[in-house]
Amino acid sequence: MATVPTYHDLSFYSNPKENKARYAKLLNSFEQKYHCKPDFFSRSPGRVNIIGEHIDYNYFSVLPMAIDVDVIVSVTTSDDAKVELNNTNPEFKEEILELPSDGAVIEINKTHHTWGNYFRCSMIVAHKYILEKYPELVSGGKKPLKGLKLIFDGNVPTGGGLSSSAAFCVASILAILKANGINTITKEDLVKISVVSEHYVGVNTGGMDQCASIYGEQNKALLVQFKPKLMATPFKMPVLKPHDMVFLISNTLVEANKQETALTNYNLRVVEMAVASEFLAKKFNLELPKESNLHTGTLRGFMDEYYEKHLKQPHWDGSDIDMGVQRMQEMLRLTEIMFSEEQKVGFKTEELAKELGLSVEEFTKVFLTKIPVKYERMKIYQRTVHVYSDAMRVLQVLKLFHQHKDSDDPQKFMLAFGRLLNDSQRSEDIYNNSSSPELREVCKISLANGGYGARTTGAGWGGSAVHLTTHDKLAKLVEALTEQYYKKQFPKITQSELNAAVVVSKPAAGSCIVQLAEY
């Protein structure tokens, strides 16, 4: 079983020289603050999701890749019963976490939003893992975790849709485990514990972000599957000649703060999709496996149960692409039939409760208690269309990759790939309502200036778009985005800010421990 690697140099980066200067700067900051060298570094990269958005928590496969930007944390242990959190970014002020002397797991005040809360949630899951697997390290729970002195450095844009929070949490969890004497952890275990970390700050993530960050490999994208179990399969992407394809990521600089806007955005989608699955199940008198974060059914669960109970066919195992596409098409056909034109507009709470055969109180208890949300009407028809259509597009992209041969027309491949990305953006905009005016604008500019496809990546409502182009068209695309979006929207933007906003990345190495032989 693959374990998280430890590196003794920086050759795992695509640009080791640039990162050597970054590590040296972080080391200098650490020595100035704590008057000692760090024992080690922990790092985890951001990710870009190529296609498949808001479908991971419905257990449908997605296609992300780890990218060159990452979160690094420099670490040393301390005899003090506290954790000192610092950051090279002055926006993130120092925080001190007092460790309970009785060895209890720390708690989080969810009403007080600070960057330190993401470390707290990392400490909670790391501590629980230690209690479960290595209780002797903490005297069976009677002894606190080791005190830590930490400085973080991250170049994953916060709120940019590139999973800065997952990168931060995974790097933090790795740091805590290593500092407390756990030198080896499987990638599978690290995914399991990190997936639930952000739940402690009220964000119900589905697992794709953490999986992509942990399993990333240089020059390989990832197929992340959630059934029959959570797993990531690296695969090489087609090499096109004479001009290879490239992904450009543009941060709109409109921050998508999942924690603060979850009530009406991210968490509402989680709830709407859970309601949608139970709505469809009720139509066919099906009992769904309780596998969502709300302990309800999921849209994947509905599809599998429909095929098993109504059509007497086995559950889809996720590997047969043609079968998957056919089943998504059937789900989309059913969706159109099962919702009346009036219902397609949206449901009030009372209407949904009636459809599910519940009182308003029962509906509230099942769907609106565990994850707080705010809405006027739930648009469960739209969310259903988005989930099944984007899940189908993931499979269509996979098929495109598998079928491509070196002798094939690269232009034909790029047009087909781009069309699927554009269809995904249209669905995010119209059916999932997770795009934004700024995201629509950068996608429009892209398609007029050398982009084959462009779509919102990450949670949405701001953040970043991913653009598909080729190396020969890259300079024109960067210039167009710079002149027509960034300089218009942000006239005072600096060159360094521009460089951070527009990222061209190849698939990068995943999470690791770094113990440099020399500093």
UniProtKB/Swiss-Prot annotation:
Q: What is this protein called?
A: Galactokinase
- In this chain, ATP is annotated as bound at G159, G161, S163, S164, N257, K258
Annotated alpha-D-galactose binding lies at: R47, E53, H54, D56, D209, Y266
Question: Site: Transition state stabilizer. Where?
Answer: R47
* Enzyme class, first EC level, given as a word: transferase
Cellular-component GO terms for this entry: cytoplasm; cytosol
Give me the segments passing through the membrane. Answer: none
Single Gene Ontology BP annotation: galactose metabolic process
Check the record and name the PROSITE patterns matching this protein.
GALACTOKINASE, GHMP_KINASES_ATP
GO MF terms on file?
A: ATP binding; galactokinase activity
EC code: 2.7.1.6
Answer whether the UniProt record assigns the keyword Disulfide bond to this protein: no
Disulfide connectivity for this sequence is none
